[in-house]
Amino acid sequence: SVLLPLAKGCQDVSALNDWVQAAARENRELTAFGAVHPFMDGLEQELDRLEAWGVRGVKMMPLLQQVYPDDPQCFRLCQMLVDRDMILIAHAGRDPLDRPEVYGTPERFASLAASFPDLKLVLAHLGGLRMWDAVRRHLLPAGKNVFFDTAYVSFYIEREEMKELIAHMGPERVIFGSDYPWEMPGRAAEIIRDLGLSRAEEDAIFFKNAAELLGQPL
């Protein structure tokens, strides 16, 4: 399992990373990403610290952090991640609370991907929770380094639409996610299995794509 810590404020980052990395070191079945805020002081030092621990990527959440991903102030984070060959995973789209400002729209992430084609970018919720028409328009043509996870989408998308969207993305760009504790992993996995995908497509989504992205042996 991959832990994705979320720091809402700049001041929360370092302590949260200390805690989640300690938890991962105590359980070899866990892989922990780092928390990050693109506007924080000491960003480079925090990324250096995570890199020294062997952390493969970081999580940001534009909606809670109130950050537009294509804001030029985010570019230093993206360049630092490219320089370290680290992954950026981000919440994309709306949330269940229907906040008036989305921040992380598919269009803005497409703009970011165009600015940083070498950035390994994983967009949660199949690229944009409850914004899948915009995902089709703006993110399906995005570069080969843009991936999509399946976390928490099953409450908002019909199975046939989910299957069709995965087919258009290409199963090789889709990574299983649950967004636990908001969705139980077992339930999320059963929904993927019920889509009628091939065994090779399921294997890619459940573990092969993630293992390749993380540089882990299959």
Tell where the protein language model's regions lie, with residue ranges:
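Mid-to-C-terminal alpha-helical segments outside catalytic/metal-binding sites
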Residues: 48, 168-175, 183-218
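Short alpha-helical
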Residues: 11, 41, 129-130, 156-157, ...
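Conserved, mostly hydrophobic/aromatic
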Residues: 20, 50, 58, 81, ...
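Active-site gating/metal-coordination segments in enzymes
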Residues: 8-96, 100-103, 156
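Catalytic pocket-lining loop regions of alpha/beta-barrel enzymes
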Residues: 56-57, 70-175
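Alpha-helical elements of Rossmann-like donor-binding domains used by nucleotide-donor carbohydrate transfer enzymes
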Residues: 19, 45, 49, 76, ...
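Catalytic domains of carbohydrate-active enzymes, especially glycoside hydrolases
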Residues: 1-4
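Conserved hydrophobic residues forming the short capping helix/wall of the S-adenosyl-L-methionine
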Residues: 24, 139, 196
